[in-house]
């Protein structure tokens, strides 16, 4: 299996195919139509930004506003407003695609750290070529962003537990905090879905400590 994976990544034709797929993802983001709830999420980002920039003076009421405070949608709206009105939908899709691609690379790094580089490369290929994920990369500003937050929080949590340097640990803490705020803004129960991950790493951390103590004796 490792030889096959190395062959895939060292094969120029396969690498060219991956590059083409990246460009195809961008192409799809530009030409694809509007998702059924995209305009609502963009409006949510607009309302939140107006509220923040006006220091609470502009307080628009929209449906489910009390359930969402998505920093991601606010950030996306800020980027979208840099483009002409006729191209704001495409800009929204490109922002979503960018974070979806970061999700793929995040999974590669996480799988590489948990197992080895070959498994990381394989996870990269599987997720990239997975039709359901690829189809949602541009138009879904909820599930793909939740996946982005999940994967990178898990990766930084793993690095936090393994790193003994206090400065490095603090760096991981604020990154995890930012990602957690992104996730909870989209889905309130986001942190609850991380409980299995936290339990797994706690057991891993305790087991590693016990193993090191036994070695010292």
Question: What role is predicted for each listed range?
Answer:
Residues 15, 94-114, 152, 156:
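Transmembrane-helix motifs of polytopic, lipid-linked glycan transferases
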Residues 106, 110, 146-165, 179:
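Specific aromatic-rich, kink-prone transmembrane helix
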Residues 30-36, 54-77:
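Membrane-proximal lumenal/periplasmic loop motifs of glycosylation machinery
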């Amino acid at each position: 299996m490792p030889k096959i994976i190395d062959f895939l990544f060292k094969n120029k034709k396969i690498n060219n195919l991956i590059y083409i797929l990246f460009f195809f993802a961008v192409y799809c983001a530009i030409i694809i139509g509007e998702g059924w709830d995209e305009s609502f999420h963009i409006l949510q980002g607009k309302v939140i930004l107006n509220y923040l920039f006006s220091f609470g003076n502009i307080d628009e009421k929209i449906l489910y506003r009390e359930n969402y405070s998505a920093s991601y949608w606010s950030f996306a709206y800020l980027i979208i407003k840099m483009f002409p009105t006729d191209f704001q939908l495409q800009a929204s899709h490109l922002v979503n695609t960018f974070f979806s691609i970061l999700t793929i690379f995040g999974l590669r790094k996480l799988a590489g750290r948990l197992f080895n580089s070959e498994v990381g490369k394989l996870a990269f290929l599987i997720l990239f070529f997975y039709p359901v994920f690829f189809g949602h990369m541009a138009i879904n500003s909820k599930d793909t962003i939740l996946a982005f937050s999940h994967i990178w929080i898990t990766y930084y949590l793993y690095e936090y537990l393994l790193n003994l340097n206090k400065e490095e640990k603090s760096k991981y803490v604020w990154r995890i905090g930012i990602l957690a705020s992104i996730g909870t803004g989209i889905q309130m129960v986001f942190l609850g879905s991380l409980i299995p991950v936290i339990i797994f790493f706690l057991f891993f951390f305790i087991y590693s400590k016990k193993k090191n103590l036994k070695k010292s004796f």
